[in-house]
């Protein structure tokens, strides 16, 4: 040992990649016994006399550091907020994503609120919630979930019908399934973490939990909470359980003293993709935590994702399907077009009109559309060229009836627009959004109540009364008892998007909308045929996804392989790629130039090489960050090298 005495190993709260490691600090005599693993401290940095926040990860006697250690400046709080399990999870997630552990901890540990913390320290741990009894999971064959207590990983198909709770509220069958699984986990004396995409799903799940689990046993932890409220919920998770923790993607980092269940609803929802570095998807976080904790894992959805299908195929997860007694009645209208050319050209074919009119006599009808707004895209009335802004070349659109076209990017009103191709000045509506669709339906069904639901106008629930509900994907309200008919419009437009995931994304959103229909109600898929329509109509989405995975495996597309995106200065990207060139077990696409002058390369590699590729690219990022260049015109001054950016498993890169 080079130095003896009490030593704390800390992780600085810093985004700098070169500081993504444990640093040794001496523990002053006055703080001995108080500085323990998991507390927040403040420590001095060697440069500039600055003080940084940090988490204590380890404590001990002595250090291998050759010189004198700096001492801890301040104990921020005696409350242990970073548990060993969450630290191990953050480190593992960061390493897998070629990122920094401090970035993960910003997602895992909320910002401190002093008053909340003082109240918790004064009051002590909260009393345990009343015990509950296990009751099993309805709608599935017996023993479908028996292996969860031993750490089974299950890919579960949801019961695709609305369910009425004892309280009178209606929720999706999936919410009842998760609530029953959570109740049985509590009955075994263990914690359950339930992750859902957004507040709409969370509201349903909390209603289902309220019918089965004591309120004291449920903790809500999500990004919509105010700072103090969220920190208070987080602190509750530090107390001994058992409890159920419900929230969005960050809830997967919630501390737990005895984790028994991790469950995700609808893991293909884009909201489960983390927008902050290191961009670890919620599904990957759940898989890592399940492996570390030995808890049971449930990936639940009306249709599974291609990523989950891969887990099933390699035997890592076991598929569980509900009893086939009830499934949505889906009718692809493309099969009816051969006899009517006018229907083939119509946005809403006559068969869909008839079903909507019939259903509207008795209850609500859902019309799902691709885009919000009135007319998100307009074009030249003469030559059909898409109209673009004269300032930034963004797409022009109309936001209300009689409104003037404006740019969707910069907001500039196109007062004197002229077509760049034919010089015409007249515009026509091309892409119809929810607003324009609602307007047209209102004219087609005079006297009918028309409701628009989208991101700007959220609607959560509806009574079982006649109404036309025009909703964008993911914003569909729940109707008491279920919709009397569902129309899925703009299918061709959804599939026209250039993306590797476009078909499975469409299948997921259609399946979720179909599950909102009451049993036996018609669900009409407009304008889509082939294997995709057949998969939805027969409710055998897994067969389509199985074939999709086989095609991607042949083409070496995700999730058959993993991807790393390397971008930045051309020289920095070249150096990073050189670090991988010691063997031929990966494939590099590019580099290609980007609009900002940087370049980007894509690296394809097998899962078995994931740890090695992530570590090598992380080392390249650290080398790039620690390098300094002296501008030739300014002696004595330094500037950082061009930034090198690495992202693994970007869902939108292909």
Question: How would you label these PLM feature ranges?
Answer:
Residues 1-331, 338-341, 358-361, 477, ...:
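Accessory, non-ATPase domains that flank or precede helicase/AAA+ motor cores in DNA-metabolism machines
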Residues 12-13, 251, 456-459, 590-594:
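Short, solvent-exposed loop/turn elements at beta->coil junctions and helix N-caps
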Residues 16, 445-448, 580-587:
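Short secondary-structure junctions
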Residues 16-18, 556-560, 595-597:
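Short, flexible turn/loop "capping" segments at secondary-structure junctions
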Residues 153-186, 190-221, 228-231, 238, ...:
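Inter-lobe coupling/hinge segments of SF2-like helicase ATPases
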Residues 451-452, 584-594, 640-647:
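Short beta-strand elements
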Residues 540-542, 571-590:
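Short amphipathic alpha-helix segments
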Residues 562, 569-573, 587-615:
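Arginine-glycine-biased low-complexity disordered regions
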């Amino acid at each position: 040992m080079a130095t003896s005495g009490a030593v704390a190993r800390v992780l600085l709260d810093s985004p700098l990649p070169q500081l993504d490691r444990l640093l040794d600090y001496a523990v002053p005599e006055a703080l001995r016994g108080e500085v323990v693993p998991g507390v927040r401290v403040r420590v001095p940095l060697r440069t500039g006399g600055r003080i940084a926040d940090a988490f204590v990860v380890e404590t001990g006697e002595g250090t291998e550091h050759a010189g004198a250690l700096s001492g801890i400046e301040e104990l921020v709080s005696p409350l242990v907020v970073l548990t060993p399990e969450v630290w191990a999870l953050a480190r593992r997630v960061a390493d897998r994503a070629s990122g920094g552990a401090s970035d993960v901890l910003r997602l895992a540990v909320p910002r401190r609120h002093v008053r909340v913390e003082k109240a918790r320290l004064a009051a002590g741990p909260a009393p345990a919630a009343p015990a509950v009894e296990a009751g099993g999971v309805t709608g599935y064959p017996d023993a479908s979930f028996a292996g969860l207590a031993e750490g089974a990983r299950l890919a579960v198909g949801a019961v695709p019908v609305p369910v009425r709770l004892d309280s009178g509220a209606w929720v999706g069958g999936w919410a009842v399934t998760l609530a029953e699984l959570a109740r049985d986990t509590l009955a075994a004396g263990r914690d359950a973490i339930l992750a859902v995409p957004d507040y709409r799903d969370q509201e349903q799940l909390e209603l289902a939990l309220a019918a089965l689990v004591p309120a004291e046993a449920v903790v809500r932890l999500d990004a919509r909470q105010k700072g103090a409220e969220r920190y208070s919920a987080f602190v509750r998770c530090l107390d001994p359980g058992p409890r159920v923790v419900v929230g969005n993607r960050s809830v997967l980092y919630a501390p737990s003293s005895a984790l028994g269940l991790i469950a995700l609803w609808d893991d293909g929802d884009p909201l489960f993709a983390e927008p902050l570095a290191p961009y670890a998807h919620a599904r990957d976080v759940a898989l890592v935590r399940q492996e570390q904790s030995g808890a049971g894992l449930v990936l639940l959805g009306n249709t599974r994702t291609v990523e989950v299908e891969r887990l099933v195929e390699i035997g890592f997860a076991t598929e569980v399907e509900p009893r086939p007694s009830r499934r949505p009645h889906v009718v692809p209208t493309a099969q009816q077009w051969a006899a009517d050319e006018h229907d083939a050209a119509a946005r809403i074919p006559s068969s869909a009109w008839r079903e909507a009119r019939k259903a509207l006599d008795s209850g609500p009808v859902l019309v799902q559309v691709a885009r919000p707004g009135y007319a998100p895209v307009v074009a030249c009335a003469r030559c059909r060229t898409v109209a673009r802004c004269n300032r930034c070349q963004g797409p022009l659109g109309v936001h209300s009836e009689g409104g003037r076209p404006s740019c969707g990017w910069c907001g500039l009103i196109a007062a004197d627009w002229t077509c760049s191709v034919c010089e015409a000045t007249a515009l026509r509506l091309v892409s119809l959004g929810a607003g324009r669709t609602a307007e047209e339906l209102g004219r087609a069904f005079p006297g009918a109540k028309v409701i628009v639901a989208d991101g700007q106008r959220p609607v959560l629930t509806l009574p079982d009364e006649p109404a036309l509900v025009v909703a964008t994907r993911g914003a569909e309200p729940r109707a008491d008892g279920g919709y009397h008919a569902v129309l899925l419009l703009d299918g061709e437009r959804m599939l026209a998007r250039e993306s590797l995931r476009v078909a499975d994304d469409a299948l997921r959103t259609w399946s979720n909308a179909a599950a909102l229909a009451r049993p036996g109600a018609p669900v009409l898929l407009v304008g889509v045929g082939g294997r995709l329509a057949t998969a939805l109509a027969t409710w055998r989405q897994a067969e389509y996804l199985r074939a999709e995975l086989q095609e991607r495996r042949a083409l070496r597309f995700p999730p058959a392989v993993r991807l790393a995106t390397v971008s930045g200065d051309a020289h920095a990207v070249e150096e990073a790629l050189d670090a991988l060139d010691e063997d031929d077990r990966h494939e590099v696409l590019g580099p290609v130039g980007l609009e900002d002058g940087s370049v980007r390369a894509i690296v394809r590699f097998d899962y078995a090489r994931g740890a090695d590729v992530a570590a090598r690219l992380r080392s390249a990022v650290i080398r790039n960050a620690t390098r300094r260049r002296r501008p030739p015109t300014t002696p004595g001054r330094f500037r950082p090298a061009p930034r090198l950016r690495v992202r693994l498993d970007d869902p939108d890169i292909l």
